[in-house]
Amino acid sequence: MLEIKNLSVSVDGIDIINNLNLKITKGKKVAIMGPNGSGKSTLSNIIAGKEGYRINQGEIIFNDQNILELDPEERAASGIYLAFQYPVEIPGIANSSFLRTALNSIRKYNGQDPLDTRAFLDECKLVSEKLGLDKSFLSCLLYTSPSPRDVEE
């Protein structure tokens, strides 16, 4: 669960987020929408732990812990990642590499062994079946150069 309590944030003395309260329960899907400059990116960056923001007040509770007390690396290890909507395409690097690295970081933090490529792909298949995702979605995950952004949106 993610809960934001009375969060106020500023950048360079300019208030960006004022007294935000939000509760997202496990399994719930939420879209944060708003016009340019309304604080969507600021909120994402604050949750991920990006520097340059002043937290004037409030808490961000993730899995019963105030993550504002954690380094970005500790937040990532707890399962919080910030990924681009349109990731930079690097020839030869698939989205699956990013996802496997992220998962293995969490596994390491939890004292588990990392998954090799085969085990990771098997896990992806199990999860996609559990979620009822089309097999073409998983196939697109493995592409290295064709634009995967169409699937990620």
Region locations from a protein language model:
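The feature captures the beta-strand-to-loop junction immediately N-terminal to the Walker
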Residues: 33-35
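Conserved hydrophobic segment flanking the Walker A/P-loop of ABC-type ATPase nucleotide-binding domains
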Residues: 24-26
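ABC ATPase NBD Q-loop/coupling interface
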Residues: 59-75
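Q-loop/switch helix immediately C-terminal to the Walker
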Residues: 82, 86, 92-108, 120-123
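Single conserved hydrophobic/aromatic residue that forms the stacking wall/gate
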Residues: 140-153
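Helix-to-loop junction immediately C-terminal to a conserved catalytic motif
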Residues: 48
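Short coil-to-beta microelement around the adenine-binding A-loop and adjacent beta1/P-loop entry
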Residues: 14-15, 74
